[in-house]
């Protein structure tokens, strides 16, 4: 009995000691403070970050690194500009039909994701459509420079069909061992606008987590990615812009009802209201259907919620360019992926698990 009593007292003392140590550790742990910042110089859009850190110094260090990472990805995925010492997607396009280009792993992995998503989306996400997308890009640029909408022009079907002859994704030759990319068709080009930003956001957020950031909400042009939860244990929340009442400034009317709970999740939207120009009173947006070579007309907006921003970015474009039934089959076949479709007759349709993420 004495032995058992001694063991009990020893265990009790050890327990008290552990509790004291834990209490001491808890009291020493600094309270996290909310900070925020904005960047304007990456991916031709606005980047906003809200994060909780132990000090402003820690926050600034994290944001300097995150900003630098975004700049790097922006340069790597750029199809319009050259940068000193940087081999980017433009370099690949410039060497189409000429020679393989040795590229950074961050380009390889992004292109490999895009190739996988080409299969997943029934070919609706096709980064090899650069020749067609460039025609539409030039038409939008000309419209922006025009004094009135009356001067705006549509591309001709003849030029679009001619460009479409150079969009075969099988001519994008990726050699993972040699770390090279080769475009076998000299007239083809890559356009990674449907994957680059989302993939960059995912990689940048993963890097921030690896540096110790535990609680943040990152928005790059509306591509939302949540890191962890808030210090009080509550989840971050995201909203879906109302495609029928969109605005440059968020208001109650510009957002659809129903905030989305987000913890280590991404929320990405593609919409016909984001980038467009007007011809004869009709809006022509930037999301081009590979089958028609014209802006897809199935939806006004498609939003995807999942754990990976790159995947979400690819899916929003792919789903936007195909009928609801086909898109729903894709979403329901993917674990941890939910979607919302906003139709031209102002219906909101969601996948089976969407409502489980709504903030109560």
Which ranges hold each PLM region?
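Mature catalytic core of soluble alpha/beta enzymes
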Residues: 2-11, 18-360
């Amino acid at each position: 009995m004495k032995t058992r009593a001694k063991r009990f007292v020893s265990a009790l003392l050890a327990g008290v000691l552990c509790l004291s140590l834990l209490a001491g550790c808890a009291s020493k742990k600094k309270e996290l403070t909310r900070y925020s910042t904005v960047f304007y110089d990456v991916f031709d859009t606005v980047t906003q970050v809200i994060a909780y850190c132990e000090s402003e110094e820690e926050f600034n260090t994290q944001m300097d690194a995150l900003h630098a990472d975004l700049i790097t990805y922006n340069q790597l995925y750029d199809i319009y500009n050259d940068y000193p010492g940087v081999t980017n997607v433009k370099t690949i396009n410039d060497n189409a039909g000429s020679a393989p280009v040795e590229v950074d792993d961050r380009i390889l992995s992004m292109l490999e994701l895009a190739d996988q998503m080409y299969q997943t989306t029934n070919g609706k996400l096709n980064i090899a459509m650069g020749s067609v997308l460039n025609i539409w890009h030039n038409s939008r640029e000309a419209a922006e420079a025009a004094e009135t909408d009356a001067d705006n022009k549509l591309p001709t079907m003849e030029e679009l069909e001619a460009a479409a002859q150079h969009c075969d994704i099988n001519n994008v030759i990726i050699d993972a061992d040699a770390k090279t990319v080769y475009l076998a068709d000299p007239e083809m080009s890559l356009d990674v606008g449907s994957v680059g930003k989302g993939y960059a956001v995912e990689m940048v957020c993963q890097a921030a987590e690896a540096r110790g950031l535990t609680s943040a909400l990152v928005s790059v042009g509306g591509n939302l990615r949540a890191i962890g939860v808030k210090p009080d244990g509550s989840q971050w929340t995201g909203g879906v812009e109302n495609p029928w009442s969109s605005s440059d400034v968020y208001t109650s009317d510009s957002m659809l009802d129903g905030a989305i709970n987000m913890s280590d999740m991404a929320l990405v939207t593609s919409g016909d209201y984001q980038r467009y120009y007007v011809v004869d009173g009709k809006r022509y947006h930037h999301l081009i259907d590979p089958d028609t070579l014209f802006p897809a007309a199935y939806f006004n907006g498609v939003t995807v919620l999942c754990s990976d921003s790159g995947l979400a970015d690819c899916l929003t474009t792919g789903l936007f360019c195909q009928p609801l039934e086909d898109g729903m089959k894709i979403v329901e076949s993917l674990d941890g992926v939910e979607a919302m479709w906003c139709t031209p007759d102002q219906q909101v349709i969601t996948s089976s698990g969407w409502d489980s993420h709504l903030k109560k």
